[in-house]
């Protein structure tokens, strides 16, 4: 009954949205014309073409600096040109480390040498290819260290507070942390701040392995050998090429010495599989880890430090490599010096069907549909710039260097930057500048969800309502007319535009029904994607529609559709949340002080007691 009522409400909302005539930034007469343009645009999109393009671009490894990366960039360039866009490649020269030595050994009390290898699978056609990057964390320090092993849960500040209460110090030791609950680079940074000499990060099966579902290739989740590669660059300091902070990494740019680059970590770091983690964790003795630290392996998790001794040796090639940014433009007819920018990266750790190519091919199909519109005589009022970035995975290299080289021009001309990355099956997800919330509400009301035949906006709101944890959250969702845009931190190519240049930004994707464990592994492949992520590529089309409508409306609006009332409301909400958090922290501190006082009273020796 509840499901029927929910679907009925969604159907009514979809009908209301279908009857929408007014569009922010457009007069009524031009709104009707814009809606017709969007219908023509939508008709030009093709799930079949998106799937074919995904298969072609993910056919081989294409990390930055590799022959595959150049080949992918050149294919994208030719596609843009074939669509009628004015396209070229901008090349930057950036630092990129690759491992030449990776050794992880348990030397006592038992001996074990980590495999550090993901095996090829018959069910995954590209998993056995050569030229795959090995499993590693970029921007780890060179280092050859041996020390006691300590389990630190997820390796976050709260976990080290727990260790301190237990009287356990990691200084001079090697820590092992679970992936998850934060960006991976936080884990070795916090470990170093607490005196650790090395950091191992592993994927626990409780998070994305057999505890979550069937493992690959039978199911979508991480098998025992899967490893998440990834950057651990300290991007809080600055993103992009570590040697050229603040300036574009052109061939002749002035560069720092590597020892002076503050975003490169100070200790060796290595990611491993749960197959390799199990012998290490089994060897730990000492204090039994708290219940909420226990994981999915069939062992009792201990913290150490004790008899378990680990040897970790990481040595890198620190090479200068080319980054190929593919830039394509459609010149505006009325305001050519106002730019609507759209971006997605093309580099991957290995084949990268999900991350990033599922977003890249959706963006390319948008460009194809815009090219078809150009053939009908349509021209955008503002200049549209499509950007296929290189080097996102190691640290937002391509987008950051482009933004640094063109910073003054972008600050003068860019009116919005619309980003995407990986894409999958499920619910609309949007983050960005809150002044664009109403703008995105109108767009998500105009795009129909492939599975439910209601708007993607209404399906998202229904999902939020069903999954809300408290009555307060449910009331807030029901009381808000549209959808909130999530605050953007970092982690994708919007970072330099939003946080360094102050350009209004959107970050768009679909997902939530495409869980799995392939992320940054050799199994992020076309075979995995077509089985478990978006088998019909219908959500690739949904992303093309959502981002494409945003591009079209921004490019053709008579007035740019910013609504700063949403920004004011969001800032006020954040201020309230900070105040409430401060009050809660004061209460918790007072309670902990009382508990400590009671503990001291109970444990203080009674000097008056007669024996």
Annotate each language-model stretch with its function.
Residues 127-162, 237-354, 368, 372-376:
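Soluble metallo-hydrolase cores and metallopeptidase-like ectodomains found primarily
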